[in-house]
């Protein structure tokens, strides 16, 4: 019984950490600019349909930005989210 509770607690903690907004690069410095269509660019973690909607990282050599598909446990499927990540990371 104790091991089952430990496994469930670990799984719940993993879901909370992996689903956190900072995992999309929200803490990485980025430029919030007005797009040609008059709207502001979308910050990391926001829904998107194409990469041109997403805000770009200030350091474009180290970081890459764009719209990527990620699993959402809350919505029960894949969603497109703006994301900024380190170019050298295997998660990018």
UniProtKB/Swiss-Prot annotation:
Annotated organism of origin: Trittame loki
Keywords assigned by UniProt, alphabetized: Disulfide bond, Ion channel impairing toxin, Knottin, Neurotoxin, Secreted, Signal, Toxin
Compartment list: Secreted
Protein name: Toxin ICK-17
Disulfide bond as UniProt keyword: yes
Tissue specificity of this protein: Expressed by the venom gland.
Purpose: Probable neurotoxin with ion channel impairing activity.
Signal peptide span: 1-19
GO molecular function: ion channel regulator activity; toxin activity
Main subcellular localisation: secreted
Family: Belongs to the neurotoxin 21 family.
InterPro entries in the record: Cys_Knot_tox
GO cellular component, one term: extracellular region
Disulfide cross-links: 41-55, 48-67, 54-82, 85-92
Domain statement: The presence of a 'disulfide through disulfide knot' structurally defines this protein as a knottin.
